[in-house]
């Protein structure tokens, strides 16, 4: 068995590949061994562009940002050219005009392996929960405490929020669908990666017949630049994420999430947390705490060691290029 850091660097960099008959390598964390599960060369790559201001695009423009500072559309097209044997999905959402939707069609026609997937066309209902149930569960929890231990201010807020749920909008998913900030982006990224291959197959797009609905996907932010084919990837228990490092302090990020199967239990754990809190965050809770729960991370472990264990990096990906420019939002 190899150390977690060495296995991840060695295999993610695509410098070796295990044969079909070779036993899988294993890595350990918190006293438990995990197989380095393969993510094969047919696994689709997924990008995402949720556009809060579609009116900023001119006539004949694909409504995905493509400026000198933020060449996101060019990065997606470049990935499609390099990974020409993979399906490249782009999950999109926004109040697009008819003409802008035609531009998406033109993009698909010009690059046959690019598939535009509209968020509203994907069935995410299996991941939903009534907002009223979330509020009621939190209210009942507060009410179960002795009177001296209750947070009466919070209890009042919860009751007020419960009353203010709009008619016909009693849905966790619908509440995020109406947002136009980073949590809008982050929440549906989590659901898309949970669906994995099913995100591609259920939309009926041509060219997706070789994708298994139970398979995984490789999610990359549009500021991640692919420079060559990724090959076969390996991840502990079939999941890994991008890790940022600033002044030797590491942190889990959601700019890249790779999974070998749909409904990965680490992301399901994060979704369970999202469904239990009224103030949950799709990045901190849905990804970070979900991973920690799944892999039994606690404050007793070294956080940097955990980040090394779960890190996705690849010699053929230049990550997080937008860190050098201002936000595109």
From Swiss-Prot:
Short sequence motif DXD motif: positions: 221-223
Record GO terms (molecular function): glycosyltransferase activity; metal ion binding; protein-arginine N-acetylglucosaminyltransferase activity; toxin activity
Active site feature: 253 (proton acceptor)
Catalytic class of the enzyme: transferase
Transmembrane residue ranges: none
GO term, biological process aspect, one: symbiont-mediated perturbation of host defense response
Post-translational modification: Auto-glycosylated: arginine GlcNAcylation is required for activity toward death domain-containing host target proteins.
EC number(s) recorded for this UniProt protein: 2.4.1.-
Residues that coordinate or bind UDP-N-acetyl-alpha-D-glucosamine: 48-50, 72, 219-222, 322, 327-329
Pfam families assigned: SseK_NleB
Subcellular location: Secreted; Host cell
Gene3D superfamilies with a match to the protein in the record: 3.90.550.20
Residues the entry annotates as binding Mn(2+): 223, 320, 322
Domain of life where this protein originates: Bacteria
Keywords per UniProt: Glycoprotein, Glycosyltransferase, Manganese, Metal-binding, Secreted, Toxin, Transferase, Virulence
Main localization of the protein described in the UniProt heading: secreted
Family indicated by similarity: Belongs to the glycosyltransferase NleB family.
Function per UniProt: Protein-arginine N-acetylglucosaminyltransferase effector that disrupts TNF signaling in infected cells, including NF-kappa-B signaling, apoptosis and necroptosis. Acts by catalyzing the transfer of a single N-acetylglucosamine (GlcNAc) to a conserved arginine residue in the death domain of host proteins FADD, TNFRSF1A and RIPK1: arginine GlcNAcylation prevents homotypic/heterotypic death domain interactions and assembly of the oligomeric TNF-alpha receptor complex, thereby disrupting TNF signaling. Has preference for host FADD as substrate compared to TNFRSF1A and RIPK1.
Domain notes: Adopts a GT-A fold and acts as an inverting enzyme that converts the alpha-configuration in the UDP-N-acetyl-alpha-D-glucosamine donor to the beta configuration in the N-linked (GlcNAc) arginine product.
Protein name: Protein-arginine N-acetylglucosaminyltransferase NleB
UniProt organism field: Citrobacter rodentium
Gene: nleB
